[in-house]
Amino acid sequence: MSPPRFSGRQDGRTDPTTALPRVLCLHGGGTNARIFRTQCRVIRAHLADSFRLVFADGPFPSGPGPDVTAVYGDWGPFRAWLPHPAVKDPDVDKIDECIAAAMAADDRAGATGAWVGLLGFSQGARVAASLLLRQQRHQQRQKASLGFAYGATNAISEYRFAVLFAGRGPLLDMGAGDDNTRPEAELLELPTIHVHGLQDPGLEMHRDLLRCCLGSSARLVQWDGDHRVPIRRKDVSAVAAEIRDLASRGILGDG
């Protein structure tokens, strides 16, 4: 089965972001790339001079997520990254296929920037953090000279950070680690920015994901909202400021 469609630039105009560093964006369960691109319209505007945001569709058909039909009822089909929210061992190959398809399509659209980060909401945030842990494991094995290849994303394992909107813990096992090591026994050490809505019913589970990350490399942005992507200027500005601060500290390298 072919991976579902991706979403990048959706018109034929010249795109000034093609040479910028790229951030792969993973939607929440029960939405899709097109919806997530719209939900991220304010953060995209804040970062438009610094990053190109590219939106991928999850591999699994899904019913619409909470409150999705009220605004986006005609924007289906809806997708998910996991076949069921309770899944602990995801279908890594299908996730990798969707990510690789979105990346390849963006290359064909003329984009040339390095893939420097991940950005996800809800289920997509959990998957994004888990992908970052997989990369960390792979890098640790490389340092130990064990030489390990782990699938479709082996050649694109240079993410520098992840922005995690309302992502739940614990981390998922995406592979690239010791067969006897579960992700809950490890801390994610690569830089993460956690965005929590203080009125979100799942807030404590989002704090679980924060606790899965090394304190010195995890940043927290809190805003007075529920389970959605913030769009108020002051809330989004706080997230964008954290991303720009990472860049100013050299986290993003030359990409």
From Swiss-Prot:
Residue positions of the active site: S122, D200, H227
A Gene Ontology cellular-component term: cytoplasm
InterPro entries: AB_hydrolase_fold, FSH-like_dom, LovG
Biotechnological utility: Azasperpyranones display potential anti-cancer activities. Azasperpyranones A, C, D, and F exhibit potent growth-inhibitory activity against the A549, HepG2, HCT-116, and HL-60 cell lines, with IC(50) values of 2.39-14.42 mm, respectively. Moreover, azasperpyranone D significantly inhibits HCT-116 xenograft tumor growth in BALB/c-nu mice. In addition, azasperpyranones A and C can bind with four kinds of therapeutic targets for cancer, eEF2K, FGFR, survivin, and TNF-a.
Enzyme Commission numbers on file: 3.1.2.-
Keywords: Hydrolase
Annotated family: Belongs to the LovG family.
Name of the molecule in the record: Probable esterase ATEG_07663
Organism field: Aspergillus terreus (strain NIH 2624 / FGSC A1156)
